[in-house]
């Protein structure tokens, strides 16, 4: 786990150091956005985004992850966001 985190941090640092010269500014900007998104996810330790809740089949609320704020929808048998 620590090695994976270190690799991710190194990747983010490399993306952050890339220069936006010679017509590469758009790619550099996209890399900056990706790097900041990765760091934000690492800092907040987020799991799956909410869009994956509707695909998870469940029988009780405890089977749904933290993003499925609606818990288990008994009529559909799937996790729900609200």
Swiss-Prot record:
Localization annotation: Secreted
> Record's InterPro entries?
Toxin_Pg
Tell me which residues bear 4-carboxyglutamate.
60, 63
Q: What is its main location?
A: secreted
- Signal peptide region: 1-23
Q: Which residues carry this modification: 4-hydroxyproline?
A: 49-50
Question: Which GO MF term does the entry hold, naming one?
Answer: toxin activity
Tissue specificity as recorded in UniProt: Expressed by the venom duct.
> In this UniProt entry, which cysteines form S-S bonds?
53-68, 58-72, 64-79
Provide GO CC annotations from the record: extracellular region
- Propeptide positions: the record gives 24-46
Q: Which UniProt keywords apply?
A: Disulfide bond, Gamma-carboxyglutamic acid, Hydroxylation, Secreted, Signal, Toxin
UniProt lists the family membership as follows: Belongs to the Pg turripeptide superfamily.
Q: What is known of its domains?
A: The cysteine framework is IX (C-C-C-C-C-C).
Q: What name appears for this protein in its UniProt entry?
A: Turripeptide Gdm9.1
Organism, as annotated = Gemmula diomedea (Gem-turris)
């Amino acid at each position: 786990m620590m090695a994976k985190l270190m690799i991710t941090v190194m990747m983010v640092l490399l993306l952050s150091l890339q220069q936006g010269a010679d017509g590469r500014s758009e790619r550099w900007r996209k890399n900056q956005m990706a790097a900041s998104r990765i760091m934000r996810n690492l800092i907040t330790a987020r799991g799956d985004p909410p869009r994956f809740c509707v695909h998870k089949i469940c029988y009780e609320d405890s089977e749904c992850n933290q993003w499925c704020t609606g818990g288990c929808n008994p009529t559909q048998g799937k996790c729900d966001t609200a």
